């Protein structure tokens, strides 16, 4: 895994190219990423960098976490995230340092992970895009039913994984191979082409794309 940044989804807007084309973009604030710990093979069994983002009141921080952050000399954040990196990259970082938008560049392909917007309990039409039944012509009280969910006495059960009604959204999702359309280094903003998971103000994780095409 590559080194990335933790950010906050600000919202969506659009920008224009020199040719006048409109590009929908999502604004992601990625400032104030602070390194809290460097993990190594010798001490932890693997190599990674631990990062915190945002701020949190001291009264909301547990004593073990407060001691952990004090050792690195950083302020408590809302999120703590680890990025698996190689030993060479870990040697360039140190606890207490900051990460900024210069990790990325315009045109780079990235993956963005976030928690999708919760929709509550949903039917199969909204949740799985099932077709609805006929409105008339002999159909009564079966307009939005999912249909058959299995056989009869044999096997006598509904197979696991059957697409049915249930809770929709509020799940961790990753959108891959998005493109960085613009970077505002002064305000520490990434403008990502297209939509990303989550609601406004939601926390997201931005990393270089793992399936980027050369």
From Swiss-Prot:
Post-translational modification: Methylated by PrmB.
Keywords per UniProt: Methylation, Ribonucleoprotein, Ribosomal protein, RNA-binding, rRNA-binding
Disulfide bonding pattern of the chain: none
GO MF annotation list: rRNA binding; structural constituent of ribosome
One term under GO cellular component: cytosolic large ribosomal subunit
GO biological process terms on file: translation
InterPro entries for the chain: Ribosomal_uL3, Ribosomal_uL3_bac/org-type, Ribosomal_uL3_CS, Transl_B-barrel_sf
Region annotation Disordered: where it falls in the sequence: 133-153
Positions of post-translational N5-methylglutamine modification: 153
Function of the protein: One of the primary rRNA binding proteins, it binds directly near the 3'-end of the 23S rRNA, where it nucleates assembly of the 50S subunit.
Subunit structure of this chain's protein: Part of the 50S ribosomal subunit. Forms a cluster with proteins L14 and L19.
Protein name as catalogued: Large ribosomal subunit protein uL3
Source organism of the structure: Cupriavidus metallidurans (strain ATCC 43123 / DSM 2839 / NBRC 102507 / CH34) (Ralstonia metallidurans)
């Amino acid at each position: 895994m590559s080194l990335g940044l933790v950010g906050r989804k600000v919202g969506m807007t659009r920008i224009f190219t020199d040719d006048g084309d409109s590009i929908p973009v999502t604004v992601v604030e990625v400032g104030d990423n602070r390194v809290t710990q460097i993990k190594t093979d010798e001490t932890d069994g693997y190599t990674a960098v631990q990062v915190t983002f945002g701020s949190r009141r001291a009264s909301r921080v547990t004593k073990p976490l407060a001691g952990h952050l004090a050792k690195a000399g950083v302020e408590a954040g809302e999120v703590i995230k680890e990025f698996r990196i190689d030993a060479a990259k870990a040697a360039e970082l140190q606890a207490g340092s900051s990460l900024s938008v210069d990790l990325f560049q315009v045109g780079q392909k990235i993956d963005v992970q976030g928690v999708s917007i919760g929709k509550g309990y949903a039917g199969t039409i909204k949740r799985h895009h099932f077709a609805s039944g006929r409105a008339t012509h002999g159909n009564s009280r079966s307009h939005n039913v999912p249909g058959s969910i299995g056989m009869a006495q044999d096997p006598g059960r509904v197979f696991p994984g059957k697409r049915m009604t249930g809770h929709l959204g509020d799940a961790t999702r990753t959108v891959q191979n998005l493109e960085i359309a613009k970077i505002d280094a002064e305000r520490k903003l990434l403008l990502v082409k297209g939509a990303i998971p989550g609601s406004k103000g939601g926390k997201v994780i931005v990393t270089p794309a793992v399936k980027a095409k050369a």
